[in-house]
């Protein structure tokens, strides 16, 4: 009897309206006779996945080139199938296999469901259940020769959905559960064109590169190597005829306050003259900067000086035991002053102590009492204050008196006071970055400077009038807005209806106010990335409060609840979750972190690390904590930011528990897998996935996987498909019942 082997080879369909995923896969007919020297079959490998998209207004043409490799010793045949996301308006669909055009059969959702369920029954693998309820394209693929490559090309056109002027493009990339190996080469390139000037261009799913070409065009790119994608690619964009565009995205479930994102971005015009700014570069030349650190700092400063705009003014302050300004005033960025600045930079010598307070005060002194120019300080240091004022609170208090200044700090290495630099940045509406010894300081500084090169709107104020009440907005203090950049504000709201929003600030020396009409929805549950991004920033804010100001019960409890609900797992949040569930005496079968809960040695190690998180201000673990917090506080994409924050936390753990030690092995157990699927967090314990909503529910029902009762449950709750697709053993809450799905 033939058996079916499901081998996923890519995600080919786009769902611009539906937030569900659409995955392409091959069902390979396994031969009756299988040579004993080659059993079981090795899955097909995706060697390349290239996506090219052209969007004109709301019309998107998506072209996909994929190459698949059959590593088996036998010829294979089967069906290539891909589900159509709900609501997608697909037109002009074409497909090539091995260079030949083929016709795909379109099956309606009821017939497609039968195919999905048949495969699940035979394979005893529920991964396809997330597609139940979708139409399906199906085409036969033959032959798939042994040890050969099979190229497949797909092209389709669709009309993208616009919600109050915000257009969404979705390309399903989440092939983690299907891919046999990481995809060697993966790229997504989008050429975007609009009749009106483009404003916000934002991906809530991936870190993308955005290159704008004038006011109406942009190219968006994402590339990776050896990746198993587990997040669909999503792009949100808008147009606006005003100098600054503002768009609102909401998420409002029943019975709860809403969540929102505000996207603010300046429109771009090649003819616009860059606004003038004042910049002071403050460089640490103390003895500890000797070697590569000072050389990279010099290269970074030369780059910044050479890239000053024509109307900018600048100053350079070198400091070690004392501060030494070059010009003692702001000077024009003409060729003569740039030449003198580069000569000054060339003469830097690493010697002496670290007079941080004096250096920053020297920088702030050159700011005129009355000026329309944005005033920016770029501060590079690798040490702690050892000369002059050394009390961090006093240093921060003195700096805050210089209102209007923005101090962007770069901490180099691990001997920096991260709390001091973070508080300086927070108090001046800027941010801090930390550059490790093995990282490229020049690249970090030059990338940052390119970002802030052209101010668009400074000293921002946002007023959301009307009956809707907003709260817990992050960032709490709005930073300045620069050309080519955008501001993403995440918050909560109560109420619903139309709001007149006013965004004001200084643009080119003039106060300007922009007015927008926004609508806060009474119910909307499509953009489920919105609450998780808000929660990521909120957790960053709460942990920062604990790290800087001390722990309270309220801070701890809210951090724990958000981390569990949204799957924001780091060593620190894992510890809080375990301790909370222990205190509440949650049954072991329902616990999120069962292995850590049952291992007292692991809990002791993580508890020790939690104490270090609250107390460490410098050192490898102190810098790791700061970088982890920055990943959360300034999150643009929740999945990437959570992964980055967790990675930084683990790096800090490694400093306290070197690799190969029992402590390191125990600490590594914290990183058990969690997934955020269709608005819910699930935690993996062995071969079981546990719904974060499943605790404290009395009514429970056990259902055998792959039984008729199992498929009836899916029929009754079609929304459960993506959750059931996690595996054969799932603990899942639906309505008032917790279902224990088990083999």
Annotate the PLM regions.
Residues 19-261, 493, 504, 550-584, ...:
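Subset of Sec-pathway N-terminal targeting signals
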Residues 185-189, 377, 406-407, 728-730:
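Hydrophobic beta-strand segments of well-ordered beta-sheets in folded domains
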Residues 88, 196-198, 208, 364, ...:
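Short glycine-aromatic motifs
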Residues 65, 133-137, 141-155, 164-168, ...:
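Exposed acidic/Ser/Thr-rich ligand/metal-binding surfaces
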Residues 4-7, 12, 16-52, 96, ...:
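Pro/Ser/Thr/Gly-rich intrinsically disordered low-complexity regions
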Residues 186-190, 425, 600:
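N-terminal secretion/transport leader regions
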């Amino acid at each position: 009897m033939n058996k079916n082997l499901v081998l996923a080879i890519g995600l080919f369909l786009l769902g611009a309206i539906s937030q569900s995923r659409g995955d392409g896969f091959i069902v390979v007919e396994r031969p009756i006779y299988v040579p004993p020297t080659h059993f079981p079959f090795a899955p097909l490998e995706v060697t390349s996945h290239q996506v090219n998209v052209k969007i004109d207004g709301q019309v998107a043409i998506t072209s996909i080139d994929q190459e698949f490799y059959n590593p088996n010793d036998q010829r294979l045949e089967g069906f290539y199938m891909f589900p159509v996301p709900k609501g997608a308006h697909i037109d002009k669909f074409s497909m090539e296999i091995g260079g030949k055009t083929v016709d795909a059969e379109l099956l309606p959702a009821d017939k497609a469901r039968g195919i999905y369920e048949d495969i699940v029954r035979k394979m005893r693998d529920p991964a396809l259940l997330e597609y139940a309820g979708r139409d399906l394209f199906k085409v036969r693929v033959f032959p798939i020769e042994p040890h050969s490559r099979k190229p497949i090309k797909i092209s389709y056109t669709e009309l993208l959905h616009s919600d109050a002027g915000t257009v969404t493009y979705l390309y399903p990339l989440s092939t983690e559960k299907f891919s046999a190996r990481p995809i060697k080469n993966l790229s997504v390139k989008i050429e975007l064109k609009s009749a009106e000037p483009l404003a916000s261009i934002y991906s809530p799913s991936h870190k993308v590169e955005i290159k704008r070409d004038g006011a109406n065009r942009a190219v968006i790119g994402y590339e990776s190597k050896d990746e198993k994608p587990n997040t669909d690619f999503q792009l949100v964009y808008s147009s606006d005829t005003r100098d600054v565009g503002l768009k609102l995205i909401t998420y409002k479930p029943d019975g709860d306050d809403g969540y929102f994102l505000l996207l603010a971005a300046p429109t771009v015009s090649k003819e616009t003259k860059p606004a003038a700014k004042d910049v002071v570069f403050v460089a640490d030349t103390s003895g500890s900067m000797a070697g590569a650190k000072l050389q990279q700092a010099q290269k970074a400063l030369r780059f910044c000086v050479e890239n000053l705009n024509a109307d900018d003014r600048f100053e350079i302050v070198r400091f070690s035991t004392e501060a030494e300004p070059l010009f003692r005033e702001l000077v024009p960025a003409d060729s003569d002053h740039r030449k003198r600045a580069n000569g000054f930079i060339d003469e830097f010598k690493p010697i002496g102590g670290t007079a941080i307070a004096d250096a920053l005060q020297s920088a702030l002194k050159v700011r005129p009492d009355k000026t329309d120019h944005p005033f920016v300080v770029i501060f590079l240091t690798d040490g702690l204050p050892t000369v002059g004022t050394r009390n961090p609170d006093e240093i921060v208090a003195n700096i805050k008196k210089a209102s209007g200044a923005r101090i962007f700090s770069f901490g180099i290495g691990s001997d920096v006071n991260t709390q001091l630099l973070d508080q300086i940045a927070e108090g001046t509406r800027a941010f801090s970055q930390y550059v490790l010894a093995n990282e490229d300081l020049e690249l970090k500084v030059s990338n940052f400077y390119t970002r802030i090169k052209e101010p668009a709107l400074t000293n921002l104020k946002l007023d959301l009038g009307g009956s809707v009440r907003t709260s817990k907005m992050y960032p709490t203090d709005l930073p300045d807005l620069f050309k080519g950049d955008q501001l993403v504000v995440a918050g909560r709201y109560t109420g619903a209806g139309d709001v007149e929003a006013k965004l004001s600030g200084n643009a080119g020396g003039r106060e300007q106010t922009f007015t927008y009409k926004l609508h806060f929805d009474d119910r909307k549950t499509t953009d489920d990335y919105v609450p998780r991004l808000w929660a990521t920033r909120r957790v960053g804010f709460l942990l920062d409060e604990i790290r800087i100001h001390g722990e309270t019960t309220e801070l701890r409890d809210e951090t724990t609840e958000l981390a569990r609900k949204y799957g924001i797992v780091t060593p620190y949040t894992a510890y809080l979750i375990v301790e909370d569930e222990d205190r509440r005496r949650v049954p072991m079968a329902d616990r999120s972190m069962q292995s850590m809960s049952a291992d007292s040695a692991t809990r002791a190690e993580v508890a020790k690390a939690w104490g270090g998180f609250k107390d460490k201000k410098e050192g490898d673990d102190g810098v790791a904590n700061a970088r982890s917090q920055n990943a959360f506080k300034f999150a643009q994409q929740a999945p990437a930011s959570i992964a980055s924050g967790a990675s930084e936390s683990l790096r800090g753990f490694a400093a306290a528990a070197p690799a190969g030690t029992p402590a390191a092995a125990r600490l590594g157990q914290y990183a058990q897998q969690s997934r955020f699927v269709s608005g819910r967090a699930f935690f993996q314990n062995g071969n079981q996935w546990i719904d974060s909503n499943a605790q404290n529910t009395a009514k429970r029902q056990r259902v055998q996987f792959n039984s008729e009762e199992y498929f009836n449950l899916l029929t009754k709750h079609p929304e459960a498909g993506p959750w059931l697709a996690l595996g054969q053993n799932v603990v899942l809450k639906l309505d008032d019942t917790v279902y224990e799905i088990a083999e």
